[in-house]
């Protein structure tokens, strides 16, 4: 009987550790793409200190930093609304619109709102139940990958314009 109880306790502890580690991994991914130093430069670091003029700068056919940040904000805001069960604004489904709606005058607001939305997703994950996490883990992991991808693009654009400080993490 003691062995059975011992095995049940181990199984229970193992299941709890797996559930909490999924939350921990998702939070680590979200925070490393948002504002924590990890394997790569975070989004907050990638956009910090950039003027609205530099945010609107484009080289050839590439997107500007502002367009990339606006695109990230657009999709993260929709994910957060989904997670919270909120109604989303209508959207045509044309991904190009998520880049094209950036306006240089709104740069500082985009940066602030992006920080708030990313924090909102992190808070949602922190407070989510196991069932909520299970249902949304793939979406959250993909958001992190999406944000990391576009953060890399932001750094490439900043390097091209000469506004990137290599001391921030990428030479």
Q: Where are each of the predicted segments found?
A:
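Acidic/histidine-rich alpha-helical segments that form the ligand environment
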Residues: 99-131, 138-141
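An acidic intrinsically disordered interaction segment
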Residues: 33-40, 110-116
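Short, contiguous alpha-helical
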Residues: 31-34, 40, 44-47, 52-96, ...
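Short glycine/proline- and charge-enriched loop/turn segments
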Residues: 24, 95-99
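Short N-terminal segments immediately surrounding and downstream of signal-peptide cleavage
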Residues: 19-35
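Bacterial Sec-dependent N-terminal signal peptides
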Residues: 1-22
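Short flexible/disordered coil segments
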Residues: 24, 114-128, 146-156
């Amino acid at each position: 009987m003691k062995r059975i109880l011992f095995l049940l306790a181990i199984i229970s502890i193992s299941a709890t550790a797996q559930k909490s580690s999924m939350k921990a991994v998702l939070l680590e991914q979200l925070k490393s793409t948002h504002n924590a130093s990890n394997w790569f430069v975070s989004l907050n670091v990638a956009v910090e200190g950039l003027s609205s003029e530099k945010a609107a700068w484009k080289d050839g056919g590439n997107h500007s930093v502002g367009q990339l940040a606006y695109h990230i904000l657009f999709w993260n805001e929709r994910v957060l609304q989904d997670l919270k069960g909120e109604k989303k604004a209508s959207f045509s489904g044309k991904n190009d619109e998520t880049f094209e709606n950036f306006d240089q005058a709104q740069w500082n607001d985009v940066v602030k709102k992006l920080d708030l939305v990313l924090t909102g997703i992190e808070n949602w994950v922190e407070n989510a139940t196991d069932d909520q996490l299970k249902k949304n883990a793939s979406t959250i992991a993909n958001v992190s990958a999406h944000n990391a991808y576009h953060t890399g693009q932001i750094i490439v654009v900043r390097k091209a314009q000469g506004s990137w400080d290599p001391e921030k993490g990428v030479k």
